[in-house]
């Protein structure tokens, strides 16, 4: 999710260097707290005899519209257009107060860097990758549809379910509407430079009401390299929140994705379109005694969304997401998803929201019936336990406060 917050400055210092030249530094605390009630249908339950059934659930969800988190961001003006900066960002669970990832204090970002006003900024540490930065702005889940409205399991990482560890990242300044960036994650394994290595490239062009972006992402051993063997906040594809049917899908030798998107502002309306192609190579989800190496699977995802601002405080929005999943040498499964939402800003920092998400799966089916082993269509709204059928619905209402 994107990180646009109005923070509170804790410290501002001016240190004399020589004559009238001063270095100014600041440290800012910023973040958000988000919570809401979620009603969902058909959450799968495994019975004692191995069969599955479904039930409705009412839950308290935290970090829905925007992940609940806090951050310390610092900058220092070194003069001559050069600035040093850092960001340390922690995500937590609103319902329990626990960290999202045990043992990882700054699980979202931990980086330091230098920026030049003429060229751009180079940063080092754990951080969001360039592909997700440039393309994620066109996904409804990053503005109003909540993380539950993201693409299937956030398989294309537009919601930044996984970040890059041990990464170097460059982001350019605006050159007449053109910006670009790249991220390189060092795997750090002796004797195997490619192990857990990742990189991404992206560019964007903005002119008046029109915005266009394109990017590419490559990550080896994504489950271990970016997620540490556990899930990012989207969840169930990596078994974080429950024993989901799609566990181990991201346990693959590599993940490669590319995409393009754009948006246009027309009076009070904003229209956006984004397309991504993601391929997981040798996914262990498809492994068997006869095929221990796993099988490749690709996802072609297209999203069209629209937001209409009735007033500066009140918006209505809708999105349609189509996802075609194809197993190498095999069959296809299609996921259709509709997101509907409304937001009302009580102030610059506080907003109320209500979102409804419906998903339907069709085709051969990516799910596996635990009792029979046959392929079935199991819908799964991101961050929920997968459905016991080809349909699932979620409705939520909550409040988000930025600080």
PLM region spans:
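Bacterial N-terminal signal peptides that target proteins for export
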Residues: 1-8
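Detector for outer-membrane/organellar transmembrane beta-barrel domains
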Residues: 202-341, 357, 390
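Outer-membrane beta-barrel "beta-signal"
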Residues: 346, 387-403
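Sec/Tat signal peptide C-region and signal peptidase I cleavage site
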Residues: 19-23
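Gram-negative outer-membrane beta-barrel proteins
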Residues: 37-45, 92-98, 130-134, 188-192, ...
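Outer membrane beta-barrel
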Residues: 24-39, 57-187, 195-199, 204-217, ...
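Extracellular loop and loop/strand-boundary signature of outer-membrane beta-barrel proteins
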Residues: 54-58, 98, 155, 187-188, ...
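Bacterial N-terminal signal peptides
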Residues: 9-18
């Amino acid at each position: 999710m994107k990180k646009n917050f109005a923070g509170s400055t804790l410290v501002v210092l001016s240190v004399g260097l020589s004559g009238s030249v001063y270095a100014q530094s600041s440290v800012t605390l910023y973040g958000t707290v988000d919570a809401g009630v979620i009603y969902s249908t058909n959450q799968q339950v495994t019975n004692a005899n191995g069969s599955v059934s479904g039930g409705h659930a009412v839950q308290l969800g935290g970090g829905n519209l925007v992940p609940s988190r806090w951050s310390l961001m610092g900058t220092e003006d070194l003069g001559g257009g050069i600035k040093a900066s850092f960001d340390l960002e922690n995500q937590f669970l609103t319902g329990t107060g626990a960290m999202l990832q045990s043992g990882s204090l700054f699980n979202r970002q931990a980086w330091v860097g230098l920026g030049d006003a003429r060229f751009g900024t180079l940063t080092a540490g754990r951080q969001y990758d360039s592909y997700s930065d440039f393309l994620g702005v066109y996904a409804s889940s990053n503005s109003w549809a909540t993380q539950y409205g993201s693409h299937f399991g956030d398989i294309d990482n537009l919601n930044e379910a996984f970040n890059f560890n041990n990464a170097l990242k460059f982001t350019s300044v605006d050159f007449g509407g053109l910006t670009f960036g790249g991220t390189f994650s060092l795997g750090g394994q002796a004797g195997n430079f490619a192990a857990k290595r990742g990189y991404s490239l992206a560019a964007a062009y903005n002119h008046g009401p029109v915005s266009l972006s394109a990017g590419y992402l490559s990550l080896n051993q994504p489950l271990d390299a970016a997620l540490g063997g556990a899930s990012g906040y989207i969840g169930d594809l990596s078994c974080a929140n429950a024993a989901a049917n799609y566990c181990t899908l991201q346990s693959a030798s590599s993940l490669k994705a590319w995409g393009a998107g754009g948006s246009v502002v027309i009076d009070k309306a904003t229209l956006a379109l984004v397309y991504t192609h993601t391929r997981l190579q040798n996914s262990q989800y498809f492994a068997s005694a006869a095929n221990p190496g796993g099988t490749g699977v690709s996802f072609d995802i297209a999203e069209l969304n629209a937001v209409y601002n009735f007033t500066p405080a009140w918006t209505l929005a809708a999105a349609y997401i189509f996802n075609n999943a194809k197993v190498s040498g095999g069959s296809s499964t299609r996921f259709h998803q509709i997101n509907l939402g409304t937001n009302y800003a009580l102030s610059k920092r506080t907003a109320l929201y209500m979102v409804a998400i419906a998903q339907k799966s069709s085709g051969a089916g990516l799910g596996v019936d635990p009792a029979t082993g046959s392929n079935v269509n199991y819908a799964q709204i991101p961050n929920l336990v997968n459905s016991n059928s080809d349909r699932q619905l979620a409705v939520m209402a909550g409040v988000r406060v930025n600080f």
